[in-house]
From Swiss-Prot:
It comes from Campylobacter curvus (strain 525.92). One of its GO terms (molecular function) is translation elongation factor activity. This is Elongation factor Ts. InterPro entries: EF-Ts_dimer_sf, Transl_elong_EFTs/EF1B, Transl_elong_EFTs/EF1B_dimer, Transl_elong_Ts_CS, UBA-like_sf. The lineage of its organism: Bacteria, Pseudomonadati, Campylobacterota, Epsilonproteobacteria, Campylobacterales. Residues 81-84 are annotated as: Involved in Mg(2+) ion dislocation from EF-Tu.
Length: 354
């Protein structure tokens, strides 16, 4: 198996062993990362390699926003335990690191390690912090978003430091951008709580929507079986799950269906124009459940659950005198995608007593 530079880099970062030692171990293990860790340990290169068993999946998410809301940075720095995450020194480390990343315009962990903080190479500074705090610490990821003179960015990190969000908006004017900063922060708070994965239904892949629609219908049908058994009202089974599935032709057909219903009900044609928009809105609400779950603009606003973020955004644009469009969205949740290590206490004691 070909041993790539990326594989060597990952093994080196997880074990702290030398680059050539990592390359040799990977070659001997035929590319198997865990076997390579074991080989390093067996060869006496494993003091640092033992760090790989000390999974850093706790820690903090940190957010730094510049004074004029033109630049914002989010980072996740992991520790092994929640106890250390509450340590003031670790909290200061995350804050200082995030501010440093933003100030220097750093875009990668490699660039971060080579940078200088307080007159010391960051890699050395960070190792000193690990030694002082006494746990394996990892700068897992970070991202910075920026705005021009007509844009605005803002951020929010939940008080427990486990969730952080950045949102960037393009505005019609610099004046609108300045006025919109607090509103954008409120949207960040919404996203922290409601967990949208993308900005708009337009960002959802077609295959993903179709797959999720099948799962959604199965979920609702299963729930309906229980509701029917209990004699309760059943869920409506939607015809669609996302606005991405509702073409202009489909919408025209729905409007014709509504007109036929109104005609059958004997409603005068002169009032149809007042009724149809509300029914169309209801149709969208019933048939965009996936958007409501996964897209920022499609979700109902936590501060006004009668309106979607898209509707609130339109109202705020009108209020501030210029269009506001969400163009950037980043959400970090602590440890997402990491497997947390579950310690076997009995096995640990047995190992220590031989």
């Amino acid at each position: 198996m070909e041993i790539t530079a990326q594989m060597v880099k990952e093994l080196r970062e997880s074990t702290g062993a030398g680059m050539m030692d990592c390359k040799k171990a990977l070659s001997e293990a035929d590319g198997d990362m865990q076997k390579a860790v074991d080989i390093l340990r067996e060869k006496g290169l494993g003091q640092a390699a033992k760090k790989a068993d000390r999974l850093a999946s706790e820690g903090l998410v940190s957010v730094e926003v510049c004074e004029h809301c033109k630049r914002a940075t989010i980072s996740e720095i992991n520790s092994e335990t929640d106890f250390v995450a509450r340590n003031p020194q670790f909290q200061a480390l995350t804050k200082d690191t995030t501010a440093h990343i933003q100030a220097k315009g750093i875009t990668s962990v490699e660039e971060l390690n080579e940078s200088t903080l307080n007159g010391v190479k960051f890699e050395e500074y960070f190792k000193t912090q690990i030694a002082t705090i006494g746990e394996n610490l990892v700068v897992r990821r970070f991202e910075t978003i920026s705005a021009d003179e007509k844009g605005v960015v803002n951020g929010y990190v939940h008080s427990n430091g486990r969730v952080g969000v950045l949102i960037g908006a393009a505005c019609q004017s610099e004046e609108v951008a300045q006025k919109a900063a607090e509103f954008i922060r409120n949207l960040c708070m919404h996203a922290a709580a409601m967990k949208p994965t993308v900005i708009s239904y337009k960002d959802l892949e077609k295959d993903f929507v179709e797959k999720e629609f099948i799962a959604l219908k199965a979920e609702l049908e299963k729930e309906n079986e229980e509701l029917k058994r209990l004699g309760k009202p059943l869920h409506h089974i939607p015809r669609f799950a996302s606005r991405s599935q509702i073409t202009p032709e489909i919408l025209a057909g729905v409007e014709n269906e509504i007109k036929e219903e109104l005609k059958a009900e004997g409603k005068p044609e002169k009032i149809w124009d007042k009724i149809i928009p509300g029914k169309i809105e209801r149709f969208y609400a019933d048939n965009t459940i996936l958007d409501q779950r996964l897209t920022l603009l499609g979700q109902f606003y936590v501060m006004d659950d009668k309106k979607t973020i898209e509707q609130v955004l339109a109202e705020k644009s009108k209020e501030l005198g210029g269009k506001i469009e969400i163009v950037k969205y980043v959400r970090f949740e602590l440890g997402e995608g990491l497997e947390k290590k579950v310690d076997d206490f009995a096995a640990e004691v047995a190992a220590q007593i031989g």
